[in-house]
């Protein structure tokens, strides 16, 4: 036999009514008219790594100029996919055109260097104003080091994992 729980008066609320409990809503309150203005004055440094590439990045408040090993972003990375990948941390924070980026890249190929530059840029932006910049960059995954590297070739195998054809007889 089921015993009564003592909860017999259950109220149902309309979401639009004033009586609707605020703690049940999942919407976050919007900050109306508040836009964050960066206050950084000096340069910010960040080191990024991806595969075997290393990027040393310096971010300075400016006009959106890019210098990578003495070349512009479009010269150094002609591939639009790499350019978009690199600019993602600035786009996430809404800082496109607000900072000049100077970077020294070495090691690895184009894809690894693009990933290293994005990682270094995200670290530099996070170091600039950790309170405001770090949470969105962390949530987007830009501050996480991608630890994947090429696996070494093993003796007796053709590649890292590819074995020669096996014959039973």
Curated annotation (Swiss-Prot):
The keyword Iron-sulfur does not apply. InterPro entries: Ribosomal_Su5_D2-typ_SF, Ribosomal_uS9, Ribosomal_uS9_bac/plastid, Ribosomal_uS9_CS, Ribsml_uS5_D2-typ_fold_subgr. One of its GO terms (biological process) is translation. The keyword Ribosomal protein applies. Gene3D superfamilies: 3.30.230.10. GO terms for molecular function: RNA binding; structural constituent of ribosome. Residues 9-21 have a biased composition (Acidic residues). Residues 150-169 have a biased composition (Basic residues). One of its GO terms (cellular component) is small ribosomal subunit. Residues 1-29, 128-169 are annotated as: Disordered. Keywords: Ribonucleoprotein, Ribosomal protein. Belongs to the universal ribosomal protein uS9 family. This is Small ribosomal subunit protein uS9. The lineage of its organism: Bacteria, Bacillati, Actinomycetota, Actinomycetes, Streptosporangiales.
